[in-house]
């Protein structure tokens, strides 16, 4: 008799994806973040579901309903902070996951990479809409500023913004639709993540050396399940430390003030994980130019497969490209810092230089490093 996990139509799919999956024997801990992203997504859906049971998407009661969750609902404060800080952990894992793909040349799996970028964009949209829901000062003004950017689109801009708002300003209609989208998008993300996995299993996983590993594969279970459980425990430990000791460290104190359309906060800024893109947006004095730079700062990832000039896939044996990669990481950290600073000297010029360097590295310096390395190896 055949084992049920190999014969049952549904369990068979799970078996081929997580149990008997042939996996390269040399993949490092940088590959752990894919499973951590799955854990983060499930955690966000579950905590979000419990929050939605008590939340009211109405401008008059939204702020009070969040306060009610924290004060009166059993462990409501914990669910709320798990959800808020879970988003931060999600983005940390996501940035590392994308960085790992870039470093080890995983972008040569075109379909997997492109669906990954779509996932990134959907996730950013979901997080932005979630930030609006508590209806604090930063929620309201963040929503106003970011949605207003669409007015830079020639001819249809103003109509588009009013259509998104559902009126002439961010109001009840905006909050209701943002809640609806924030609720449905995680399930779309889940479907996209399954598609992402499906395309990955068509080609098989990449590995640090970047060369085919068909001759040296091991089953995913028990080797990598144990490794993933260790990563998951560390993630949960860090998340619980954040939630139980300093839940507001990554948030903005202005969001504890109820939204007031008549009073603008001194510094409007998004959550920390959007600050790099926000810094690029602010570094261009022209509104349309800033919006284009902001959009292109994420969409540029779609060009990376066609900008790959090296004859080696991974950066493991390419010291020049490694320097460029870590320079890019340092540049993104600089942009994140600048995004949280006020618009004044010297932050303006630092932001502009960091933005120029960001695009130069991806479009010019990294492809150039690949060409130089090829010539050094006489290829």
From Swiss-Prot:
Residues that coordinate or bind heme b b562: 83, 182
Cofactors named for this entry: heme b
Keyword Cytoplasm: no
InterPro entries in UniProt: Cyt_b/b6_C, Cyt_b/b6_C_sf, Cyt_b/b6_N, Cytb/b6-like_sf, Cytochrome_b, Cytochrome_b_C_euk/bac, Cytochrome_b_N_euk/bac, Di-haem_cyt_TM
One example GO MF annotation: ubiquinol-cytochrome-c reductase activity
Example of a GO cellular component annotation carried by this entry: respiratory chain complex III
Protein keywords: Electron transport, Heme, Iron, Membrane, Metal-binding, Mitochondrion, Mitochondrion inner membrane, Respiratory chain, Transmembrane, Transmembrane helix, Transport, Ubiquinone
Alphabetized PROSITE patterns for the sequence: CYTB_CTER, CYTB_NTER
CDD domains, sorted: cytochrome_b_C (cd00290), Cytochrome_b_N (cd00284)
Subcellular location: Mitochondrion inner membrane
Family membership noted in the UniProt record: Belongs to the cytochrome b family.
PANTHER family found in the cross-reference section: CYTOCHROME B (PTHR19271:SF16)
Quaternary context: The cytochrome bc1 complex contains 11 subunits: 3 respiratory subunits (MT-CYB, CYC1 and UQCRFS1), 2 core proteins (UQCRC1 and UQCRC2) and 6 low-molecular weight proteins (UQCRH/QCR6, UQCRB/QCR7, UQCRQ/QCR8, UQCR10/QCR9, UQCR11/QCR10 and a cleavage product of UQCRFS1). This cytochrome bc1 complex then forms a dimer.
Function: Component of the ubiquinol-cytochrome c reductase complex (complex III or cytochrome b-c1 complex) that is part of the mitochondrial respiratory chain. The b-c1 complex mediates electron transfer from ubiquinol to cytochrome c. Contributes to the generation of a proton gradient across the mitochondrial membrane that is then used for ATP synthesis.
Official protein name in the record: Cytochrome b
Name of the gene this protein is made from: MT-CYB
């Amino acid at each position: 008799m055949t084992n049920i996990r190999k014969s049952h139509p549904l369990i068979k799919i799970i078996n081929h994806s997580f149990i008997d999956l042939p996996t390269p024997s040399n993949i490092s801990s940088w590959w752990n973040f894919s499973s951590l992203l799955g854990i983060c997504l499930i955690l966000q859906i579950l905590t979000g579901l419990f929050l939605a049971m008590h939340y009211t998407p109405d401008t008059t009661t939204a702020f009070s309903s969040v306060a009610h969750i924290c004060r009166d609902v059993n462990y409501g404060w914990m669910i709320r902070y798990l959800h808020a800080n879970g988003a931060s952990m999600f983005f940390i894992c996501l940035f590392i996951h994308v960085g790992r793909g870039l470093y080890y040349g995983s972008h040569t799996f075109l379909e997997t990479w492109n669906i990954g970028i779509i996932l990134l964009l959907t996730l950013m949209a979901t997080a932005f809409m979630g930030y609006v829901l508590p209806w604090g000062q930063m929620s309201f003004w963040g929503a106003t500023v970011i949605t207003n950017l669409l007015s830079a689109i020639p001819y249809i801009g103003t109509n588009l913004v009013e259509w998104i708002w559902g009126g002439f300003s961010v109001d009840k209609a905006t909050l209701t639709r943002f809640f609806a989208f924030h609720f449905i998008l995680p399930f779309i993300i889940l479907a996209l993540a399954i598609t992402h996995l499906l395309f990955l299993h068509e080609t098989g996983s990449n590995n640090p050396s970047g060369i085919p590993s068909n001759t040296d594969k091991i089953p995913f279970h028990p080797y990598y399940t144990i490794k993933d459980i260790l990563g998951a425990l560390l993630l949960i430990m860090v998340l619980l430390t954040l939630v139980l000791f300093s839940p507001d460290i990554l948030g903005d104190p202005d969001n504890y003030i109820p939204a007031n359309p008549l009073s603008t906060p001194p510094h409007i800024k998004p959550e920390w994980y959007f600050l790099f893109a926000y810094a690029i947006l602010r570094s261009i004095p022209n509104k349309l130019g800033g919006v284009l730079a902001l959009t292109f700062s994420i969409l540029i990832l779609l060009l990376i497969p066609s900008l790959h000039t090296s004859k080696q896939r991974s950066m493991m044996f390419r010291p020049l490209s490694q320097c460029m990669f870590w320079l890019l990481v340092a540049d993104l950290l600089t942009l994140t810092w600048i995004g949280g600073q006020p618009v004044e000297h010297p932050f303006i010029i630092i932001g502009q230089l960091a933005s120029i360097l960001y695009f130069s590295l991806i479009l010019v310096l990294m492809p150039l490093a690949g060409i130089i390395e090829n010539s050094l190896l006489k290829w």
